[in-house]
Design a protein with these regions (language model features):
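Surface-exposed, interaction-prone regions used to assemble/regulate multi-protein complexes
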Residues: 2-126
Length: 126
């Protein structure tokens, strides 16, 4: 299962390079990004053998509604950015966003369940 998670993630990461972020939302285990071409990507915290970030490309209509998430983050600071690079680590994904720099999506465990973490979780001070 781990190999398929990584293969799907790698394919999704390749396909989002050059796309422009229109909206984004997150909750504890999901980060959903909508692009200006009516596609999106969903990053999930999963635990096939150890916590990792899964990713899949979807149509914008398939993106979850995370507007009322308990642990919501204001992602407006990445709106309008283009994804210049998208790289996978063993348990994380690093996106290089035009004009704001890198965003790392990591995973961890809380009470045996995986969750997502973000660095930075807000824009850097200029």
């Amino acid at each position: 299962m781990t190999q398929s998670v990584h293969a799907n993630r790698d394919a999704a990461l390749k396909s989002i390079i050059g796309k422009k972020v229109q909206q984004a939302a997150s909750e504890l285990t999901i980060f959903a990004v909508k692009f200006d071409d009516e596609t999106g990507v969903i990053f999930d915290a999963v635990q096939p053998s150890s916590p990792t970030v899964a990713a899949r490309l979807v149509s914008a209509a398939e993106l979850p509604n995370l507007a009322e998430a308990v642990c919501s983050v204001d992602w407006s600071w990445i709106y309008g950015c283009t994804i210049d690079e998208a790289n996978a680590g063993s348990s994380s994904v690093r996106l290089k966003l035009s004009s704001v720099g890198p965003l790392t999506i990591g995973t961890g465990l809380w009470e045996g369940k995986p969750f997502l973490s973000f660095q930075p979780f807000r824009p850097a001070k200029k």
